[in-house]
Amino acid sequence: MQRYIYNVIALVAACAATLMVGCGGISDERTHTLKVYNWGDYIDEDLIAEFEEWYEEQTGESVMVVYQTFDINEVMLAKIENGHADFDVVCPSEYIIERMMRNELLQPILTPEFEAEINAKDINYFDCVSPYIKEQFSLLEAPEGQNPNDYSVGYMWGTTGILYNAKYVSEEEAMSWSLMFDERLQDKIFVKDAFRDVYSPILVYAKTLEKRASGELGEDEMLSIETIRELMYDSSDESIALVESYLKRMKELVAGWEADFGKEMMTQEKAWINLMWSGDAVWAIEEATNVGVELAYTVPEEGSVVWFDGWVIPKYAVNTRAARYFINFMCKPENAIRNMDATGYVSVVTNEEVLDYISSEEDYDEALDLSYLFVHADGTPIEGSDSVFTDPVLYPSRSVIDRCAVMHDSGDRTDKMLEMWSRVKGDNLSTGMLVGIILFFSVMLVLGVARKINNYRKRQAHRKRRRHQFEHKAKH
C-alpha cells in the first residue's frame, strides 16, 4: 500500500513538474534564472539573495534564484525523471544520487573549464570539502568509468542512532539496538518513518545476533566494517524477511512511526527512546535542556548508518553555469557555517575556519579525535583536529564512524522493501482515503505551482523596476 501511495504522489509530482515546464512566462529569462530544489528548512535563506549579488560580481551576469523545497526523495526524483523538470541544482540523498547516476540523469559539476575559471578568480571552495566525505562519495555505485565525485558535491551529513531519556535509560543500554526490543519501554518508543534508515541498522543487529548464535562471533564481538558495508547492499528476500520478523516484534512496543514529531515527544517525555537522525537529535537535546529534561544520543555498538545529502546538476538543467557557481558558493566556509547555524545539521566543509567555529572547551568536557575528518587537501590532518572539544552527536569520533556505513540504492528491490515496511506498520487505507490523498496532493502541488509562478512574476517585475531605476540614475 505504501508503495502505491508513493507511486501516486510521484505521478502527481511529475504532472506538476510538466505544468511548470509548460507554463508561459517562465522561460522568458530562463538563462538568467537559477532553479534550486532542496529539502525544506535546509539552508540559511539569506544566502539565496546574497548568492545573486555574488554571482553578478563574479560573472557580470544577473541571476534570479527560484528556490523550491521537497520532503521526499522519490517525489523529487519523479519530477526530474518522469516530468523532465528543469531544476538546475538539486540536493538528494546518497542512494538517490546513485540511482540518478545509473539512469544518466546527472551532469558533471567540476568540469576542467569551470575549475580553471574559478581558480583564476581564486574562488575555488570545492577543496574545502573534507577528503573523508569525498572518499565516502567515491563508494557510491556509478556506471563504469564515472567518478561519483565528478557528479555530486556533499552538503550535509550525519548518523542514525538512538535518542534516549537519561532518566529512564542508561548509556550502556542505549549502546545496543537491543534497547528497541526492551519490553520495559512499551509505548515509550518512537521510530523514524524512513524505511531505509530503519531497515539497515536492524539488519546489522539481526545478523550480529545470528553470527553470535552460530559461533562465528564471540558473545561480545561485533561485525567488521567490511561486513556492515556489504549488508548495506543486502535487500535479498531472506534479509527482508529477517528484518520484517524483528520489526514486527518491535512494533508491539512502538508508540508511533514519526516523520518529524518524535523530537517533541521526547522533549515532553511522552517517549523515552527514538530511532532518529543525529541532526534531529541535537535539536531535541537542546530543546529538552530548556525544560529540564536530559536527553542523549548514541550510535549503537553493533553498527549503523552514516548518511549524506549532496548537490547535483540534473540532466534537464538549463543554467548549468550558475548551478556550478551556486554549489561552489555553498562550499565557502563562512556560508557552510551559516547553513549549520540555520539547520542544526553538519556541513561537509571542514577547514580551519570551521574547526575553530565548532570548538568550545567551555561547553564540552571530552576532546574528540576528528583528524579523520578535518584534513588538508594533501591528506595531512589540520592542526588541533586530533583533540577537539565539540558536540559528539554532530561530530562522531573515528571509533563511532568505523562502525557506520553508507546506504545504497536497492534498485528494483525497493518495492519489496516498501511492501515489507507497509506490512509491519499495518498500512491499510480505504479507497476513499486513497482518493482523498490523491486529491490533496494534486491540489497542493497545483497550488504550489501557481504560487511559484506568481512569486516568480512578482520578482521579475521587481527586477525590471530595479533595472529601470538603475538606468534612470545612470542617465542623470
Regions found by a protein language model. Name each.
Residues 314-400, 444:
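Mature extracytoplasmic/periplasmic domains
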Residues 252-316:
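Extracytoplasmic/periplasmic substrate-binding proteins
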Residues 19-22:
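C-terminal motif of bacterial Sec signal peptides marking the signal peptidase cleavage site
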Residues 70, 92, 191, 257-258, ...:
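Short beta-strand and adjacent tight-turn residues that come in two discontinuous sequence segments
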Residues 37, 42-45, 101-270, 284:
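Extracytoplasmic ligand-binding site segments that recognize negatively charged/polar headgroups
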Residues 1-9:
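Bacterial N-terminal signal peptides that target proteins for export
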Residues 382-476:
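Conserved C-terminal helix/tail region of periplasmic/extracytoplasmic solute-binding proteins
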